[in-house]
Amino acid sequence: MATVPEPINEVMAYYSDENELLFEADGPKQMKSCTQHLDLGSMGDGNIQLQISHQLYNKSFRQVVSVIVAMEKLRSRAYEHVFRDDDLRSILSFIFEEEPVIFETSSDELLCDAAVQSVKCKLQDREQKSLVLDSPCVLKALHLLSQEMSREVVFCMSFVQGEERDNKIPVALGIRDKNLYLSWVKKGDTPTLQLEEVDPKVYPKRNMEKRFVFYKTEIKNTVEFESVLYPNWYISTSQIEEKPVFLGHFRGGQDITDFRMETLSP
């Protein structure tokens, strides 16, 4: 930042013998008398203001007027000052008081506001059994005739928040035009698959509760759905006709865990 010069030094710098010439013994007396009526108020609107007092000075009149001339030269000098960041910071520090700002955000709220991507699809197990809604909250697997295909359930598969690993994608399976989602409930020590009714104003959402979330894994032309909280527990169908869909603990045996998925156009 620019430093303010000492007034005395600056005055002496502009003091010269030329100022004295006005008051030499052989100088014009008229010039001396004119200085007695000098109007200092007409020197401009600078920051330096002088006032003449009628009291007696210890210094000679010559010295006083020399100081006036030097001060006038000093006033006419242009000082350049570059406005820097530190100057602005100093000004703001007098106006504002710094306080720590704490942001309280909820990841759940942000995730709920995020758009949920979903696809509509139909599922058939490897035995080509279709999934149908047999009663309000029971999902069964059975073979359908061509004229019965309208009974087949259409799923709304939502891609939800969760850790993706080993080609496993977290999804939630809801039934289209129904407020029903596949979830699990624990009965004793065994997780059991169920259709759970939800609030359509809240679901689907990005941050679904874990009971709704399954890992979708693609294996060749089929997909599997594994519980996120219960590894090696899969959405399964029985080889027996018209049995409810359940959560099974075995792969490659009597329980069918692989499905063919048909993606529907939006």
Curated annotation (Swiss-Prot):
Other comment: IL1B production occurs in 2 steps, each being controlled by different stimuli. First, inflammatory signals, such as LPS, stimulate the synthesis and promote the accumulation of cytosolic stores of pro-IL1B (priming). Then additional signals are required for inflammasome assembly, leading to CASP1 activation, pro-IL1B processing and eventually secretion of the active cytokine. IL1B processing and secretion are temporarily associated.
GO cellular component term, pick one: cytosol
Purpose of the protein: Potent pro-inflammatory cytokine. Initially discovered as the major endogenous pyrogen, induces prostaglandin synthesis, neutrophil influx and activation, T-cell activation and cytokine production, B-cell activation and antibody production, and fibroblast proliferation and collagen production. Promotes Th17 differentiation of T-cells. Synergizes with IL12/interleukin-12 to induce IFNG synthesis from T-helper 1 (Th1) cells. Plays a role in angiogenesis by inducing VEGF production synergistically with TNF and IL6.
UniProt-recorded name of the protein: Interleukin-1 beta
Subunit structure: Monomer. In its precursor form, weakly interacts with full-length MEFV; the mature cytokine does not interact at all. Interacts with integrins ITGAV:ITGBV and ITGA5:ITGB1; integrin-binding is required for IL1B signaling. Interacts with cargo receptor TMED10; the interaction is direct and is required for the secretion of IL1B mature form. Interacts with HSP90AB1; the interaction facilitates cargo translocation into the ERGIC. Interacts with HSP90B1; the interaction facilitates cargo translocation into the ERGIC.
Classification via PANTHER family: INTERLEUKIN-1 BETA, INTERLEUKIN-1 FAMILY MEMBER
Annotated GO biological process: cellular response to lipopolysaccharide; cytokine-mediated signaling pathway; fever generation; immune response; positive regulation of cell division; positive regulation of immature T cell proliferation in thymus; positive regulation of T-helper 1 cell cytokine production; positive regulation of type II interferon production
UniProt subcellular location: Cytoplasm, Cytosol; Secreted; Lysosome; Secreted, Extracellular exosome
Site (described: Important for interaction with integrin): K168, K178, K187, K201
Keyword Cytoplasm tagged: yes
Chief localisation class: cytoplasm
SMART domains for this protein: IL1
GO molecular function, one term: interleukin-1 receptor binding
Any Pfam family the entry gives: IL1
Family of the protein in this entry: Belongs to the IL-1 family.
